[in-house]
Amino acid sequence: TVTASTTLNFAGAGTATITNLNGTAPEAILTVNRVASGGASLSTLTLNGAGTFNGIISLYSNTTGGSQNNILNLNHAQAAQYATIKLGGYGYTTGASVLKAGVDTSISKLEHNNAAALITGEGTTLTITGDSSSYGGSFGGTVTVDYTGGGTFTLGNSDKNTALTPAASPNATLKISRGTLSLFSGNVTWSQKLVMGDGTTLSIQDGPSVTGYASYNATSVNSGG
């Protein structure tokens, strides 16, 4: 049970498993920090059971060697259903944080830290249910990230002039079932599948041009920007 802000430091390779991550503490931050340098060894925190924690799970890979070496594996449909997940890392080539949907699962909110982040899974869906979310990282594998919150999902870097090029598999999908997809950083090169639900909105903010392609399965998609 997490009732106050706590830090879990990984100094080397290995896996830590929490069966039920519980705690009613929306201001609490569980920081999972990769602090080792060098190598491509992986540090993994696996959540194996249903949890009630409604604070922030913050992953940051503060390493100067290796890659994708700080992993949060959600291995239950309700492992982090009420939590906010914040992802970031030193850099894609030197250390990134990874959110893995080991099964179909849900979280409340996704929070932008920086671009060195990856959401991945194989044939699984990560559903985001909260009012708003933001993300500046990549999508990998065959994961589907489905935003159902009805508010705004912001995709892009905090600096509109900084390019966002998701280093991801073309088989990954970002789906907006309800609400608005806002491309905050206009400089986006898109290679994933983008699915917009009926009555959703695609908003392109001021910034450089957007390139790539999108395939809509909706009968009605609004646009603005």
Where are these regions (language model features)?
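Surface-exposed loop/turn positions within long extracellular repeat scaffolds
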Residues: 1-2, 12-28, 42-118, 132-142, ...
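Parallel beta-helix/beta-solenoid
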Residues: 10-11, 31-36, 145-151
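Short, charged low-complexity linear motifs
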Residues: 34, 39-40, 122-123
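Polar, glycosylation-prone regions of secreted, cell-surface, and some intracellular proteins
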Residues: 105, 124-125, 147
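Short, surface-exposed polybasic-and-hydrophobic patches located at secondary-structure transitions
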Residues: 121-130
